[in-house]
């Protein structure tokens, strides 16, 4: 079995209203020193099999086709 983590984040320059709302909420809760906040998504996926190259190709295809909007989001695939 192969375990992977996919992290999806907005590309630089793309507005992040949810991140901005979190940033303002943290300031309102008196957390000092918080600069910019960007929000993203994390997916933990388990795949059957042991072929890491095939797993990486499948995971990237999952991102390109469903998990990430590649017009406005970047993704990173980590295989454990």
Residue ranges and their predicted role:
Residues 1-80:
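Long, contiguous binding/interaction regions
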């Amino acid at each position: 079995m192969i375990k992977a983590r996919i992290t999806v984040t907005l590309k630089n320059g793309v507005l992040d209203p949810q991140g901005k709302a979190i940033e303002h909420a943290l300031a309102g809760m008196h957390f000092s020193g918080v600069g910019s906040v960007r929000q993203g998504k994390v997916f933990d996926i388990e795949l059957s099999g042991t072929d890491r190259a095939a797993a990486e190709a499948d995971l990237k295809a999952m991102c390109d086709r469903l998990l990430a909007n590649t017009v406005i989001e970047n993704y990173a695939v980590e295989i454990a």
